Regions:
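OB-fold and OB-like single-stranded nucleic-acid-recognition modules
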Residues: 1-326
Length: 326
């Protein structure tokens, strides 16, 4: 099976860096040196994004330093963040590329509910030159493949229609033992990635014929900012009172998409998708019940075998693996 597209690129001002070099102990009890932590980037619209990074210092069973260790160590040496900049210093403009969205599920300490979100795992870091920093677009973009699970009208918190549509995409996390072979991947986990298609592209979006259950590639912009609204309240006498309301605006805005295809076109089957769904349900239940180690239970249904059945000659294009079962 080929590798599904899952690409995040972020360019922005470096707000702060929490990268550090440290020694950790593996599950096997072996101590290894690593660079780990997060950086925070601010885009032109004042959105801020956390990018998580990790690399071993040495190659396996070798004293040779890894490529990413050298790159991250150099980054830590050269970077200037908004948090640490002194007078006369200009904070670094950084591009994080080759990043991926990953599922992040945890149990709330306050409510006990399972919260499902996504995190950004980074790979390549580049500090833009002064000349490039003046010209580069500071933005966060995504290109992700997955199964469309739901398309519906978007509503605000007061249940009012916004005029946009919500598109729930289900990307599939994969794994491989051979990263040099783009066709040696197998499915591992399915998760939710909510997007929005805004009014100006609705007609074009609807004309493509997307349906719940089709496999697509979506490209767009990521927003994660704070919106402050001021409400002026008139009083019976004296000066009016101003109340400020702060709202976090987090959305993934679709800007383009591929021609829809079926799951069978990418070597998926109904049984394979159903197994991924059940594995997902079981994982969330185990987090809720604090059952064992999440990582150990991540493969509760065993290895998902590669599909062996042939795709139907005339597959039902209306097939939706996420629809409720009767």
């Amino acid at each position: 099976m080929r590798k599904f597209i899952n690409e995040i690129t972020i360019t922005g001002d470096l707000v702060k860096s929490e990268l550090e070099e440290k020694t950790i102990t593996t599950k096997e009890g072996k101590e290894i040196e690593v660079i780990t932590g997060s950086i925070y980037l601010r885009t032109a619209d004042k959105s801020e994004f956390e990018v998580r990074l990790y690399t071993n210092k040495f190659k396996k069973d070798s004293s040779e330093e890894t490529y990413f260790y050298k790159k991250y160590a150099k980054f830590m040496e050269d970077m200037i963040s908004i948090e640490t900049a002194v007078e006369g210093q200009v904070p670094s403009v950084v591009t994080a590329s080759g990043c991926e969205i990953r599922p992040n599920d945890y149990k709330s300490k306050n409510t006990g509910d399972v919260i499902s979100s996504t995190v950004i795992n980074g790979r390549f870091l580049e500090i833009e030159s002064q000349k490039a920093a003046e010209m580069v677009s500071k933005e966060a973009s995504f290109t992700i493949e997955g199964i469309i699970g739901k398309i519906e009208d978007e509503m605000d918190k007061n249940k009012n229609l916004t005029g946009n549509k919500t598109v729930v995409l289900y990307p599939i996390r994969q794994k491989t033992e051979d990263f040099t072979n783009e066709n040696a991947y197998e499915v591992d986990e399915i998760y939710e990635y909510e997007c929005v298609i805004e009014q100006d592209l609705l007609a074009a979006f609807d004309s493509v014929g997307y349906y719940e259950g089709c496999f697509v590639e979506l490209t767009g912009k990521m927003v994660n900012t704070v919106e402050v609204k001021t409400e002026v309240i008139e009083q019976a006498f004296g000066s009016p009172i101003e109340k400020k309301k702060t709202t976090i605006v987090k959305k993934n805005v679709i800007k383009s998409g591929s021609v829809p295809s079926t799951i069978y076109d990418v070597e998926l089957t109904d049984e394979l998708v159903e197994a991924l769904k059940q594995r997902r349900v079981k994982k969330l239940e185990e987090i809720k019940l604090d059952v064992g180690n999440k990582k150990q239970n991540n493969n509760a249904f065993g290895k998902v075998a590669a599909p062996t059945q042939q795709a139907p000659v005339n597959p039902n294009v209306g097939y939706n693996p996420f629809a409720p079962k009767n």
